């Protein structure tokens, strides 16, 4: 699916009732090389929300990040995740935002990045974000939450914050 194209996205959602939105554009794109990843996130989310509305989807589940109480402390990454959430919610299709800490387990992109770094680098100077607090959640737990959320009207138009009760940094 070409999410840059509204018509392609609309066609891809034809016949669907529910959608799990996992799109995130941290890597630069050759299609939008003048913009930032935040610009790309918003463009793709807007196309997706418009296509979902056009196809009368019943529900979108979006995976974002746990947000600090003070919006002035949002990192660029978390601000982009929140703006993506708001963009998806800007249309008529109900959205459930599941805001999670790092998802731990095989197949999770954050987990895979950290694992590759630790395997390839005997010593690493840790960037500032390594001190950021997080409430990790296991991939199986996350999948159960997603499964229970999809199509559940009680969760429409809501945000759920999920993660471990223990707050850890990436350094921990």
Where is each model-derived feature located?
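Conserved beta-loop-beta element that borders a ligand/cofactor-binding pocket
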Residues: 64, 86-107, 113-116, 120, ...
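Conserved catalytic Lys-bearing alpha helix of Rossmann-like short-chain dehydrogenase/reductases
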Residues: 42-48, 80-91
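Mid/C-terminal beta-alpha module of Rossmann-like enzyme folds, strongest
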Residues: 148-172
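Active-site beta-alpha turn of Rossmann-fold NAD(P)-dependent dehydrogenases/reductases
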Residues: 23, 61-65, 99-101, 163
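Glycine-rich "substrate-gating" loop/helix at the edge of Rossmann-like oxidoreductase active sites
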Residues: 101-107, 128-139, 160-166
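NAD(P)H-binding glycine-rich loop region in Rossmannoid oxidoreductase-like domains
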Residues: 1-55, 66-73
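Short alpha-helix in the Rossmann-fold core of NAD(P)-dependent oxidoreductases
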Residues: 37-45, 61, 81, 135
């Amino acid at each position: 699916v070409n999410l840059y194209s509204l018509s392609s996205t609309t066609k891809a959602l034809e016949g669907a009732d529910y959608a799990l939105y996992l799109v995130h554009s941290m890597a630069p794109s050759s299609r939008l090389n003048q913009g930032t990843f935040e610009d790309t996130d918003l463009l793709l989310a807007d196309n997706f929300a418009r296509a979902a509305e056009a196809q009368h989807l019943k529900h979108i589940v979006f995976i974002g990040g746990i947000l600090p109480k003070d919006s002035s402390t949002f990192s660029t990454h978390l601000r982009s995740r929140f703006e993506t959430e708001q963009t998806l919610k800007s249309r008529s299709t109900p959205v459930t935002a599941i805001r999670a800490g790092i998802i731990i387990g095989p197949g999770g992109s954050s987990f895979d990045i950290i694992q590759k770094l630790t395997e390839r680098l005997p010593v690493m100077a840790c960037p500032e974000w390594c001190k950021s607090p997080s409430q990790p959640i296991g991939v199986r737990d996350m999948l159960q939450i997603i499964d229970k959320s999809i199509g559940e009207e009680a969760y429409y138009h809501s945000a759920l914050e999920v993660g471990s009760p223990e707050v850890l940094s990436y350094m921990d």
